[in-house]
């Protein structure tokens, strides 16, 4: 097996400190056809940039399965800008939407339709908080810390665990946390999950389209950090067979839900969501049927359910929300590999329509 090549950070530092002569590096990031991120860099004059100030760029869409070879140019339209935690100030990370040459959004540009829904219900002040679970793999595609050819002890000591034998690769988690904070991502926490080598971080609360933007950039950061440590990141909802899975639990509320009497508004929203269960599942990630079995703190993929403090349902209403009579609810159906634009779009649209 080849030895993974990790970043030589101490060697890189002397180059990162070099004067850039009034120029900056802008890393354009986009979502590809496979639900991953791609990026490439360009040089720009140093100044403060808003998305509308940045040039539209392009890439070879035939190499990312986003365009045919005979019409391969896909355009990158900047939509959000963040400080670059890898190169440092004044360099920037640019999140971009993908557009076709004829002026239509690319097939895999799910942000475009999400913006429309967010704008429609902007007066309702929708807030989202997403819980991203992921698994760290070695070069052999096995979870870090697992015995060769075998399985670890049953879950129980790993969730929020501390100490050797309970958690692995905490350095990646810490580095990713700091990178998000530096870039202004509204990361709100992190914890070890129920499977060794599985972790979770939370982003939010965020308003409207900022939720999808920030989660995608946080995923990009996670892969970049893991790259430096020679690790792979899996967002698969069932990374390995057993009593564990990966979700993107999605917390949601509107202004009316957060005010006195909001519990009634939540119940009305859940009634509206129920008939759209199949449509939601179609937007909630790949291979989700392996995860939503009705076991291991999941609801069944075949039916819609909700309950107070019940993690075995489609929707969980927190105990505190039920007790106070207002707050938020958690959609537990999205898989860990779900596109946050697709999730937040249908969650808002179907609970309000």
From Swiss-Prot:
The segment(s) forming the GS catalytic domain are 110-353
Give residue ranges for domain GS beta-grasp: 24-103
* Pfam families registered for this protein in UniProt: Gln-synt_C, Gln-synt_N
Q: Name one GO biological process term.
A: glutamine biosynthetic process
State a GO cellular component annotated for this protein: cytoplasm
Provide the protein's localization. Cytoplasm
Instruction: State the oligomer form and interacting partners.
Output: Homooctamer.
Protein name (database record): Glutamine synthetase
């Amino acid at each position: 097996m080849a030895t993974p090549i990790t970043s030589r950070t101490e060697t890189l530092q002397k180059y990162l400190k070099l004067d850039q002569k009034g120029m900056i590096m802008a890393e354009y990031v986009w979502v590809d056809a496979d639900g991953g991120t791609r990026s490439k860099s360009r040089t720009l004059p140093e100044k403060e940039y808003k998305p509308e100030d940045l040039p539209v760029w392009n890439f070879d869409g035939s190499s990312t399965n986003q365009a045919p070879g005979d019409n391969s140019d896909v355009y990158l339209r900047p939509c959000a800008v963040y400080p670059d935690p890898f190169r440092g100030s004044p360099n920037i990370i640019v999140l971009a939407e993908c557009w076709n040459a004829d002026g239509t959004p690319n097939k895999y540009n799910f942000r475009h339709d999400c913006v429309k829904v967010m704008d429609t219900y902007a007066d309702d002040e929708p807030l989202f908080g997403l819980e991203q679970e992921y698994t760290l793999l070695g070069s052999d595609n096995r979870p870090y810390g697992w015995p060769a050819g075998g399985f670890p002890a049953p879950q129980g000591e790993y969730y929020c665990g501390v100490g050797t034998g309970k958690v692995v690769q905490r350095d990646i988690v810490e580095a990713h946390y700091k990178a998000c904070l530096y870039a202004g991502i509204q990361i709100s926490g992190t914890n070890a999950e129920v499977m060794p080598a599985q972790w979770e971080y939370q982003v939010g609360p965020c308003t409207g389209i900022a939720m999808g933007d920030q989660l995608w950039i946080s995923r990009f950061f996670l892969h970049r950090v893991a790259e430096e440590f020679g690790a792979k990141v899996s967002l698969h909802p069932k990374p390995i067979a057993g009593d564990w899975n990966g979700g993107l639990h999605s917390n949601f509320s509107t202004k009316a839900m957060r005010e006195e009497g909001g519990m009634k508004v939540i119940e009305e929203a859940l009634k509206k969501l129920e008939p759209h269960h199949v449509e939601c599942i179609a937007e909630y990630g790949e291979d989700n049927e392996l995860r939503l079995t009705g076991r291991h703190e999941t609801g069944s993929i075949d039916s819609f359910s909700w309950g107070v403090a019940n993690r075995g349902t489609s929707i969980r209403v927190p105990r505190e929300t039920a007790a106070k009579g207002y707050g938020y609810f958690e959609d537990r159906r999205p898989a860990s590999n779900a596109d946050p634009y697709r999730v937040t779009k249908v969650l808002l649209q179907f609970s309000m329509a």
